[in-house]
Amino acid sequence: MLESIRVTEKLHWPEHELAKKFVLNAEEALITDSKRSFSSLSSGILKDTFTTGTSSYNVLLQSKEEKKHRSQKRFSSASSKQHRKPSKSPSSSHSKDPSRMTALVPGTGAGTWYCLDGQSAVFVTSSVPSPVKFTRDISITGSGLALPPKPKSKVKRRNLTRLPKPKQQPQLCRSFERGDDISGKKLCILTAIKPINLEKEKLRFFKSDYTYNPQFEYANPTLPGVLAKHSNASDRFLKQSINIMELTLQKYGSYEKFEQATGGSLLSKTRIWSHVRKYMVKEGCLGEIVVHLTEDLLSRASMTVVNGCPTLTINISTAREHWLEGMLRHEIGTHYFRGINNLQQPWNSWIGRKKHELKPNNPTEEGLASIHSVLFRKDPFLWRAALLYYTVYKASHMSFCELFKDIGKFVKDPNTRWDYCVRAKRGWTDTSEPGCFSKDQVYLDGVLQILRFRESIDFHLLTALGKVSYEDVDRLKELAVTENMRVPHFLHDHSRYMEHLERIMEVNELTDAELKNLI
């Protein structure tokens, strides 16, 4: 990977929306599960996770829209009187009998599940601004969670608590390359290069019958130096990328047929949550991550940190039945676990990385995650990594229109082609000129490097040591903190894991001789 980029996907992040989400029944909800230990997480992470909207529910719970409006009116009335006893929360009638709690699923609109161990889950939407005013009565000390005593009132009522604004947790965040805007604030490069007029230009492009080159605008376009470092595409693995896509098309006829045959049907929000919850239980991380569903994401998913809280965003328009767990292995089993493990290491800061002379964690990070995406598929074609690599290379020599037409030989659907072209041309204003944002070549680059050295890589340590390159593992293992490290379930059986790596080599017709010659 390019030295300055260390992030998966962060093309769009609605931080202003997430900041407005509230937790119902915070007093009752924030209870730690005696069966679960968060010893592997620092107190800072716990504090940020518990105070940014993650309630202690684990099963989806949402009131109907009309009930929600009535509830908000009731809460607003109650909260305006400071010395008055709090009114009942909408769920108080059910809280008397835990067995009566039912899992209601979200209807329409985007929202967020907030989860902690041991109890049911709450789904909070932000479509209507909340008038609720909370009091501060939650405190966190050390690595444990301290709660205020219950109100002594004999009447069983529930308090609504305002969660204090969290401190940013830079250690947990992926290392983003940043630039400064005019106000001096730091900018994530992937956020800065997302066009603000994307929908408008898409409409104009489609109306022109694909002959108009979009003119993108940016909220913070002052990154010429940073963009210049990522405008050089490589052709090192171009032959392999083309071969992988051609093999896929030979077997399935078209990408669309490949997608349907191997990915399965698109999932509803209910089924997405069911799969996510099941996977989190399997990995022992239920309650540690906020899950957000959206349709406004160029990638399939992203694992980021919002206000110090690990947040998984899933693009529901691409969430397919047989591919979703692969995405979870990519985002949680790879990025999240390596990020958590990194916190305990001496190189968990920029100073530490410089002191120990660490190589960039990419392309290892994204290569490993991309392998895990296809690990258990029947036909683990590296299609997406190959198409991203190819598209970036072609973008460096073509205009937007030319690129759109060129990748039509691999992908027919115009909306899918648009997404790939935008990813390759992001950061550019006039897309009639040749030019690319080369970050997306890191996936195939990383995959092929890891496959090249798969026999010598200790994959267990590669995860346990945190955000490190496979090239640094041997020299860092003596310095590493290995107690309480988090390793995903699919790495527990080493022989099975290696068998699947061999399967990936076979299906994509990659040979050791070829990789040794290239790398």
UniProtKB/Swiss-Prot annotation:
SMART domains tied to this protein: DUF1704
Metal-binding is among the record's keywords: yes
Family matches, as InterPro entries: MATCAP
Residue sites binding Zn(2+) per the record: 330, 335, 366
EC number(s) stated in the UniProt entry for this protein: 3.4.17.-
Superkingdom: Eukaryota
Swiss-Prot/TrEMBL cofactor(s): Zn(2+)
Region (Disordered) residue spans: 63-103
Single GO biological process annotation from the record: proteolysis
GO MF, any single term: carboxypeptidase activity
Keyword set, alphabetical order: Carboxypeptidase, Hydrolase, Metal-binding, Metalloprotease, Protease, Zinc
Free-text comment about domains: Putative metalloprotease with an atypical HExxxH zinc-binding motif instead of HExxH, which interrupts the active site-containing helix without affecting the integrity of the catalytic site arrangement.
Protein known as: Putative tyrosine carboxypeptidase MATCAP2
